[in-house]
């Protein structure tokens, strides 16, 4: 429902309520999982349950929306990294570092979120893979990334490092250290080539 196009802009209060609901739903799902009661999400957003159901008539609508907007954000991150003037491994660093910094804003299947049933989301997910493949191809051409590295390898690494860890203040520095180690091992001079 939230993706359906309309010929008119939503009222400002409706748009604000939807943003409040999305932020509250993301936080609640990170805190309680995908089965968090819809009433909890509405209460956390400071709106009535009727407002939630006007925007998202069923739990699946909300979950699909959260997954879709998360993939859209990941695509923006991938495109920004691909367009940067850095090396391929630098672009991958930028891409994964963005996922780490946005970990509490993303609801994705590899983060424990639901897979989306929306065809539009599959298209965005495929676009993410294509952009990451372009970065990998750039690295293959300059010899900084081995031939057998795939977009899925990079995406899984990003998902692992971007897991929400609210009680560990040193997690960001640990993630960046692990990222540096992983990216250093992507080079084509490794024994697996």
Spell out what each predicted region is.
Residues 65, 72, 76-105, 120:
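Hydrophobic alpha-helical connector segments
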Residues 1-35, 39-44, 61-64:
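Basic, helix-initiating cap at the start of DNA-binding domains
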Residues 3, 15, 19, 23, ...:
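Generic detection of well-ordered alpha-helical segments
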Residues 46-56:
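Short hydrophobic/aromatic patch on the recognition helix
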Residues 20, 40, 90-98, 153-157, ...:
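Amphipathic alpha-helical interaction segments
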Residues 1-5, 129-148, 167-193:
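C-terminal peripheral helix-coil segments that are non-catalytic and often amphipathic
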Residues 33-34, 54, 146:
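Helix-turn-helix/winged-helix DNA-binding modules
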Residues 61, 94, 98-134, 159-168:
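Short secondary-structure transition hinges
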């Amino acid at each position: 429902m939230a993706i359906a196009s309309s010929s008119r802009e939503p009222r400002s209060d409706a748009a604000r309520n939807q943003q409040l609901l999305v932020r509250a739903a993301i936080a609640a799902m990170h805190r309680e999982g995908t089965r968090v009661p819809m009433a909890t999400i509405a209460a956390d957003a400071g709106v009535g349950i009727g407002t939630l159901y006007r925007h998202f008539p069923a739990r699946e609508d909300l979950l699909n929306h959260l997954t879709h907007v998360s993939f859209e954000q990941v695509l923006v991150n991938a495109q920004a990294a691909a367009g940067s003037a850095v090396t391929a491994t630098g672009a991958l660093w930028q891409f994964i570092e963005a996922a780490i910094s946005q970990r509490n804003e993303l609801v994705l299947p590899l983060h424990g979120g639901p897979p989306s049933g929306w065809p539009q989301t599959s298209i965005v997910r495929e676009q993410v893979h294509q952009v990451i493949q372009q970065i990998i191809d750039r690295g293959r051409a300059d010899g900084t990334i081995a031939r057998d590295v795939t977009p899925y390898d990079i995406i899984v690494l990003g998902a692992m490092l971007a897991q929400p860890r609210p009680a560990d203040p040193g997690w960001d520095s640990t993630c960046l250290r692990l990222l540096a180690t992983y990216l250093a091992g992507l080079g084509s001079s490794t024994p697996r080539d």
